[in-house]
Amino acid sequence: AATTAKNIIDNSGLYLTDEQISYLLHCFGELDQMADVILVDTGAGIANHVLEFVLASPEVLVVTTPEPTSLTDSYSLLKSLYRNPKFNREYTKISVLSNRVTSAAEGRGVYDKLNTVVGQFLEGEITYAGMIPQDSALEKAIRMQKPVSLQAPLSKSARAFEVVAAELLQGESSDAYRSFGLSRLFSGFWKQKNEGVE
């Protein structure tokens, strides 16, 4: 089956008016019928709007690299998530994707580091989603601002993305997502958020 990627919302679009939220929920409702998996890229960091979006999601995929700053940012996000009273450990599946690594062993090592500190200091549990190797095709695709899967579909990084995508498709969504779909999940989240403000 062909894979299609659509850019729906970026980090600049997370500050939304009520009208924009309604439109976004309408779009999510349509996407529920079209897509098996919907990925929302919130960008790095733990700003309130990023954390709120993550809290509304049934699955969280933390993308990190071997760089110490990236690992620190990833742990900071996870710490903020686990310590937030709105976070439901039973409802949310958290996975780690090791990006731009030199080997499968390094990718697993990145996950092991995060998993150790999450277990030790947050009493949490995260799973390993896989790894994306650093290669020249990936570097070129980044410079050209094109998906490596389209730019160089036979490259190691593109094949790794296919493996990760297949795993995501085979993974079980949470009961909440299966029952209500993405639009109902986010609708409930924004309703709770607005009630908390009033």
Provide a role label for each language-model segment.
Residues 9-10, 97-99, 144-151:
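Short hinge/gating elements
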Residues 1-33, 142-143:
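P-loop/Walker-type NTP enzyme "switch/lid" segment
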Residues 18-25, 68-75, 108-111, 158-162:
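Amphipathic alpha-helical transducer elements in NTP-driven molecular machines
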Residues 147-198:
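NTP-binding/hydrolysis catalytic cores, primarily Walker-type P-loop NTPases
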Residues 117, 121, 135, 167, ...:
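Phosphate/oxyanion-binding loops and surfaces in catalytic or ligand/nucleic-acid-binding neighborhoods
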Residues 33, 37, 42-130:
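Conserved catalytic-core segment of NTP-binding enzymes
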